[in-house]
Amino acid sequence: MKVAVLDLGSLFAKIFKLSTASPAVSSHPGGAAATGSVDSGASTSLREAETLTLLPSLPPDTAASREPFTPVHTPLPASHPRSSAAAQRVEATGCSGSLPSSSGASIAPPLTPYSGSAGSVASVTLPSPGVDWATLPSVTIPLGSNSVTASSPRNPRQLRAPGEREPSVWMAPGPVPKTLFFTLPDIGEEWTSDSDSQDDPEGRGLSEGLRKQSSEKSKDPLPTNFTRNVQKAIDKFASESPSSFSSSGSRTPTEAHNSWPGSSTQSSTTGLSTERSSVSSWRDDEFDKVSAQKVHQLFWEVEELLFEGKVSPQTQNLLAECSEWARRSLHLRVVGRQLVPPTDEGFQHFQGSLPSSATHEALPHVPDHTSSSRELCISGSQIVPEVHSASALTDPDGTESADLTSCSSLKEEVYHVDGNIEEYFAFDRKQDGDEHLGQSPALRGRKRHRHGLPPISPDDCIRDAVAAEVFDHVWTNVVEILEDLIRKTWESALTGGKKHKEKLKVAENRSPHVLMSRLSTDVCSVPPSRSSDTLQPSLAPHFNPPQFPQLHRFSSNFYSDLSGVMTIQAKPLQQRPTYSADRTQNDQDDKLPGGGVGASSRHRLGRILDARGPQTSVKKTPVHRRLPSIASDPQRLKTPTVYSDEILRGTKLQTGIDYLPSPAAVQTSRSRLPPIGSETGEPNTAASGSRPVSYRGRHPQSRVFSAMPDSIERSPLRERTIVLEQLSRPSTTHTFRSDTPRKGSLTPVEFVAHTWTGQSILTGSQYLPKSYQRATLTARKRFQVAS
């Protein structure tokens, strides 16, 4: 099919060359001759023409008659066996020389001619014997044509020139066989994709603007399956927009030649769109622009008249009016009072006193600045409107006027009272030397009674700046003068400091033991600490003797070296024989089996219960407020944990009536827990009965006593039963519960003890409730739990 189209194209090219060689071709004998005329414009218009067909356009010097255009349609016989396929192919490609679709097809309407001066149709002859002649129209459209009748697919109605006829079928005279008259369909998007001709690469597609100027057919005689794709493309690009019509409903004449892809294509949005540059919005915008330009030009001319003195024809009338006002009102002034406070930034209104007189009186010039006040100065004369005389006339409209003859003194008259305008400036002036000394006391008093003016003025700011500059200059001179004296003072202070330092070194070398003994006695009165801050109160009297207070101050500020400032030396260990003996006794008590544990625990319990009364006086001793030694920290840290090489052993506590009948019952009501002291045995001292209670500081009881709440021992039978029921639960917080009676009977010493052993209670409580889950109260059962 493509080969057939190419052959037709080459054949038409050859025929076109023959037709251009001879303007008139004679008819073949026995055949019908058809001649056509080319309505061409001037040679310049033909040069600008662009053909819409595959055939090359006519040259400018083509000889053609200047007759009016007549559409010529000569029938073509259906002699080709594959005419149907050829016709469909040529329709898709848009070739003007397409063959008829079938031999028995119906008659189609003719090609709609183009109206205009530049539209031309080239009539080409087919010198083939035995067949009819056909005309191949070649429509030429000049670029940049201003014709308002150019058709577009958006225009449903063609705008025809006056005197132009409707297109009709034109039949050649003579006998003709049964033929098909057809028109070329509108070209869609498929034209470029289906045409693969390499002979005319520039004609593969039409621009969007030229497609819109193609002819519009009244009917579509072809089947819908042939024109479906083309019609979709036409409907897509030729859809109408409501903004393209004017208010009257008819198309505006400027829409045809002003339509361009950006304005004629319908967007996906609905309704009116101002961004499509419709005629109405464009018109309104243009009117606004013109009005704005006129107003801007008027203001510009007024500014030139006022500031530059340039007179333009537009401001000539304004200048004449201003001159008339100046000629008639030589002494026109605006007087009145300030009623509306100013809102401009930097301006403030200060209410003055009411005018006491109604005459035009110029106040004497009095300087505003006095020696005792700092305020702004208001310079000028006061103008007070004069009270009208009895001869003043009153107009019907309420405006007052006076006769010129009655005002022979040329006093100021008030023509009209309208508005509230007043403007004055406050400024700061220089202080005159002795100008205010010769003034009368009345004028001085008048200035002192003026209130409401701001106290700070630019003159005061200048004075402060000058005073600051003078002070800086004087201070610089003072420092230069005192520089030598300050240097000598520093040298003497440094020399005295060095001498004092040497004396201290000699004193330390001579009696180091005496100094350390004094330090140890002072340190014992305060709690020891690992930091060196606690030694500062005791070291200060030794390194800062009262006889050298000033020298030490100078030496600490101006020392250039740090030798002797920080001294590192060995600290003597503090001996605590009482505490070590108590700790040894505790370790021995914890390691005693059976009766030894019960005896020591009973003795410790009795001692704590007896110490409730005098515990206040015991804590007043400074020795009892000392912190525990560092050596006992490892044993205290090991207290919450159970040793891995030991076995936790315990006995069931006695409850009920047989609980605590004698001191021996305390021994059976306690279970064995890991000891606090070291694992190695230490000799037991005989002074355990006389050791004080408060040496335990924060842990007065052993773990055996701290693991059991002592409320069981002191509470009645009813309370003890409740506590036992609570201990039967697998809870780890029963010791610190708020609903137990222990909280009310807890003493400060016992609270400190349980604070230190609280973790051991929580750790060992998971094993303790197992001994209380038995129903028998008198049975004793030993259990072993491995850590």
From Swiss-Prot:
Biased composition (Polar residues): 37-46, 144-155, 251-261
InterPro entries linked: DUF3719, FAM149
Region (Disordered) residue spans: 22-105, 144-175, 189-226, 238-284, 432-455, 573-602, 665-697
Superkingdom of origin organism: Eukaryota
Pfam family, one: DUF3719
Start-end of Basic and acidic residues biased regions: 201-220
Biased composition (Low complexity): 51-65, 96-105, 239-250, 262-274
Biased composition, class Acidic residues, residue ranges: 189-200
Protein family according to the UniProt entry: Belongs to the FAM149 family.
Descriptive protein name: Protein FAM149A
Lineage, highest ranks first: Eukaryota, Metazoa, Chordata, Craniata, Vertebrata
